[in-house]
């Protein structure tokens, strides 16, 4: 076991040719965030003093996406192997610290496995993460003598006897900084690939009499890499099933775990029910007895106790108090707030709007930049006209207001408590308390009207 301080190196310089994309491979997303961000997050949980990111292709894109100031960016101008990548980072290694080596395209490595690897590393020597495969073709084999790890041989360089070994190298290892710098300086590229292999340091350590201790991950998926979109989609399904299983065991009822996507963090109360094809993004909090209908997208939102979100509704940066109902086919955009018992119905859109206690907007309305009191009825087709072509303006509606269907409120405008807006009215001036406002075109009756007929 090593008690030394530790830094992490993440190799992320590969182009990812088999992704057939202009995006660097490690920026392709798994569960809504770049693969390499998953690795960075795992690294940050290890207590690492420094995280060195070795990059090459698409450096500008990487730096634009990964903005954590704790990252130390290390350029690998030419991709000449894993050993060469580590050589670029070596000047940053302290002699008295351990160096943990990770890969930006191995996104599901867990902090628990990394913790066990760190605990396994001997005071002098190397801790190595390995797995056993039924078909190890293409992978570097772990060579042992009398049970002790003495080397790693790459598949292309392996003899027929060595190719029968089913214990393979994952590439993830931990070693002392001083030792690692010495071994890296001794690497050569005398192999079939003409590259500098980091794996050659295992034999160097064994020749020096230093121990190499191997540990296995809890799950094979933790060490599976991504080289193409098929592999990425497979790991996406693995990850999503793991999240679904965790939520089920915690008491969330997922009606079909295979059709649920979590792309962030979900906290929840008791007896939550989530229907099929729901996507949860960012940080979402669900209270007790919340029901989410099929096909909903919930992003960075807080939903209170006993709320029901009907199918195909989209909520982003919204806050709902208890007993609210939303949808179906409703959209709550950033800044939407619903007080207790409020209702937003089908084809209603809110943006920077607050709907007071017990207020209802049942159908076909747009409420933007609006503060709406309690007990308000918003009729079908109501629009708060908040944009004048250059600036946004606010609509304020008091308590117990009735807004008739097909009304327009041209902001900035205020409607006081108890007022009534007749159907089809365009409100351009403030409305006083308990007033009735009607502003529609006078109805005409034309007797004997003949409808037009189609020309032959």
From Swiss-Prot:
Q: Carries keyword Metal-binding?
A: yes
The pathway noted for it is: Nucleotide-sugar biosynthesis; UDP-N-acetyl-alpha-D-glucosamine biosynthesis; N-acetyl-alpha-D-glucosamine 1-phosphate from alpha-D-glucosamine 6-phosphate (route II): step 2/2; Nucleotide-sugar biosynthesis; UDP-N-acetyl-alpha-D-glucosamine biosynthesis; UDP-N-acetyl-alpha-D-glucosamine from N-acetyl-alpha-D-glucosamine 1-phosphate: step 1/1; Bacterial outer membrane biogenesis; LPS lipid A biosynthesis
Gene symbol here is glmU
Q: Residues annotated as region Linker?
A: 230-250
Cofactor binding annotation: Binds 1 Mg(2+) ion per subunit.
Extract the signal peptide range: none
- Segments of this protein annotated with the region Pyrophosphorylase: 1-229
Record-listed UDP-N-acetyl-alpha-D-glucosamine binding positions: 11-14, 25, 76, 81-82, 103-105, 140, 154, 169, 227, 333, 351, 366, 377
Positions of the UniProt region annotated as N-acetyltransferase: 251-456
Protein name per Swiss-Prot or TrEMBL? Bifunctional protein GlmU
Self-association and partners: Homotrimer.
Active-site residues, as the UniProt record annotates them: 363
Task: Provide a Gene Ontology MF annotation, just one.
Answer: magnesium ion binding
